[in-house]
Amino acid sequence: MRTLLSDRLAPITSSIGYLNVPLDTAAAGLLAWRRGLYGRVHARPVEGPLPRLIHHLEPLTGGSRSRELLVATRSPEWTAFFDCLLTGTDADTAVGQLCLSLGCKGVSLATVPHTLGTGLEPQGRYGAVQMTLYGPLRTDWLNRVRSISVAHDGSRWRFDADGTEQDFETPSAYTRRKIRDRFTSDMLAEYCAALGIEPFEEAFYGPAGVLVTSDVPTAPEGKVLRLTEAQAWFGIRPGANEQVPG
């Protein structure tokens, strides 16, 4: 399956958010939201290729996110979002809230290879390919417009699709016999491309970014790990995604 940089920066990049506004607008919105919650918030510009930008988020922290990263893309109307959560970026919370406050559209996605039981990784991970579209207005489910997901829930594969079907979708795929084939990483890339997003292309991201740091205390028993330590903790092996379907 396809992931950004073959999971070299996972778990940070296992989930990614996108806001349909330029970088400076996204940064102003994130700062305003965080200041309303935590008071003391700082922002500074950062620059470089995506791996260098992502490393500004270290160390990763369990239970709290004091560092968030906004990254310009080569589609000027889209800004990418990442954070320092140990378990991976919480794109849904940030994108959902900022779409409301900024009055824009947004996307969150997740791509996790299903390596459990394959021997490709020590512990193995439950796989998922997920995409959620957000809007500026409230819907029956927060401000989610559309959500499509194939994920292993620990006992079986599940396919779910909720909200308003979009013109760029391939609904005939949703009845395929194998559940994990109903929404694949290739399909996710095609859907994102229809919106002007190239999720798996390193060159799509940067070089400009904004690092936002909030005065959030680390959770009492939350782990604090460097990226390589987090990968060892979760048993993530970059490149394993290339050997599994999805």
Predicted regions mapped to residue ranges:
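Short amphipathic beta-strand starts and helix->beta connectors
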Residues: 1-6, 62-68, 105, 220
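Short, well-ordered loop/turn elements at secondary-structure boundaries
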Residues: 11-13, 74-77, 101-103
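Long, compositionally biased intrinsically disordered terminal regions
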Residues: 128-246
